[in-house]
């Protein structure tokens, strides 16, 4: 069985699972082809097309089951540390009413993201910002208090994500961070402490799917207070001196 046939079958299965139409499936196919071909950006270590569909596209679209994402489906979303465009680009394809900012500080990854936006037919609905989150969310910056949803996957530990997301979110907005159940148990208390200082409140995590080794969950934090004047801290401080430590 050829790779093309296997990839097409995997995409059709994922698209059907999440109610996507043929045009959306085609956009995801173009994105997968770009992911596999764009070696210089080092955006993914996966080389098997079916693994890319299942682990990157499928895992991204699993977030569609999160109620807090559905309630914010027409707002401005931001993918924090977007890297390979996961989960931001698949979700932008799946939810046409959302506008998505793909934020990353690494130039070669930003170049990939620009190409991915074009290949996926998202010009005008998704844009790339090449900057650190602290700079993009600083006082007077366009990203401050501007987003209904901040998405994060495999970027940093949860207390760090909470602090970085806080000044990016509008009041009432939500941070949705994909984690394993084990990581959430290890990082949850520190993340809750960081959230309290940053004006966010944890909500019950949402199970995305189970694997033989662990469960994938979405950690949810809602912004309940205005952004504090001291946020964001200096670049790198969230990771160097986590608030919940």
Model-derived segments and their meaning:
Residues 59, 79, 104:
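Acidic active-site catalytic centers that drive phospho-/nucleotidyl reactions
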Residues 84-97:
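Conserved SAM-binding loop of SAM-dependent methyltransferases across substrates and taxa
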């Amino acid at each position: 069985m050829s790779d093309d046939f296997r990839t097409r079958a995997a995409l059709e299965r994922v698209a059907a699972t999440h109610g996507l139409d043929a045009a959306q499936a085609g956009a995801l196919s173009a994105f997968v082809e770009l992911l596999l071909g764009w070696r210089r950006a080092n955006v993914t270590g996966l080389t098997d097309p079916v693994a890319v569909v299942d682990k990157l596209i499928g895992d991204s679209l699993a977030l569609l089951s999160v109620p807090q994402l559905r309630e914010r489906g027409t707002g401005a979303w931001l993918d924090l540390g977007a890297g390979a465009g996961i989960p931001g680009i698949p979700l932008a394809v799946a939810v046409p009413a959302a506008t998505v900012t793909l934020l990353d500080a690494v130039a070669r990854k930003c170049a990939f993201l620009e190409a991915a936006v074009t290949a996926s037919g998202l010009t005008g609905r998704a844009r790339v910002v090449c900057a650190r989150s602290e700079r993009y969310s600083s006082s007077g910056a366009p990203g401050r208090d501007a987003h209904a949803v901040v998405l994060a996957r495999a970027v940093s530990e949860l207390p760090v994500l909470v602090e970085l997301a806080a000044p990016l979110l509008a009041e009432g907005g939500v941070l949705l961070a994909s984690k394993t159940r084990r990581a959430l148990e290890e990082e949850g208390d520190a993340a809750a402490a960081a959230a309290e200082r940053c004006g966010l409140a944890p909500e019950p995590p949402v199970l995305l799917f189970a694997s033989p080794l662990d469960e994938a969950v979405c950690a949810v934090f809602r912004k309940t207070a205005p952004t504090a004047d001291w946020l964001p801290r200096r670049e790198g401080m969230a990771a160097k001196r986590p608030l919940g430590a």
